[in-house]
């Protein structure tokens, strides 16, 4: 089964790349699961301006980049969003990327790894509301890297974060397995 780890920031100098690197090192080999890192910055997605609702478009999109994004997301059985928190909410580029699609998200499990001044807790709670619209199954385990403690002078997660990540992956894989049947 495939878990898509979405690198959800496109800013220059983004912390998301450092978080993704740490996740790659700490997820390791997981029996029966492949973790694919999907970098939002690798897609030239337009602002959503479709003539129809993505949920009703049967995965047939007018834009080649949206189609490529759709295929990358559709191939996944579950997701981890690496998300910053901007102004107490979700990053616009990732929200736009989510809104551009529809059925590709439906019914799949999702977990969150946030970072920011408070560990992106407000962004993650906002993402949970958004995910519920797609009938996604959100994993309550989450990681929230706190800027003042873990991102001063580089990216230095506290030692217990690896254990938290393992618990998050265990639960996400459990959900993915049950949902896939």
Which residues make up each language-model segment?
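N-terminal beta1-alpha1-beta2 submodule of the flavodoxin-like/Rossmannoid cofactor-binding fold
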Residues: 1-83, 89-93, 156-181
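FMN-binding flavodoxin-like domain, especially the glycine-rich phosphate-binding loop
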Residues: 36, 104-181
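Helix-loop-strand module that forms the ligand-binding subsite of alpha/beta enzymes
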Residues: 58-134
């Amino acid at each position: 089964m495939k878990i898509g780890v979405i690198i959800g920031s496109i800013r220059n100098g983004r912390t998301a790349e450092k978080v993704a690197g740490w996740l790659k090192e700490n997820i390791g080999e997981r029996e029966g699961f492949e973790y694919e890192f999907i970098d939002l910055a690798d897609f030239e997605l337009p602002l959503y301006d479709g003539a129809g609702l993505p949920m009703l478009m049967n995965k047939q999109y007018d834009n080649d980049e949206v189609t490529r994004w759709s295929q990358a997301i559709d191939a996944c059985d579950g997701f981890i969003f690496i998300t910053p928190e901007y102004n107490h909410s979700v990053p616009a580029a990732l929200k736009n990327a989510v809104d551009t699609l529809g059925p590709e998200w439906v019914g799949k499990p999702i977990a969150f790894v946030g970072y920011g001044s408070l560990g992106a807790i407000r962004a993650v709670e906002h993402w949970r509301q958004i995910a519920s619209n797609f009938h996604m199954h959100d994993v309550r385990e989450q990681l929230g890297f706190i800027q003042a403690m873990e991102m001063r002078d580089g990216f230095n997660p506290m030692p217990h974060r690896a254990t938290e990540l393992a618990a998050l992956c265990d639960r996400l894989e459990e959900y993915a397995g049950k949902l896939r049947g």
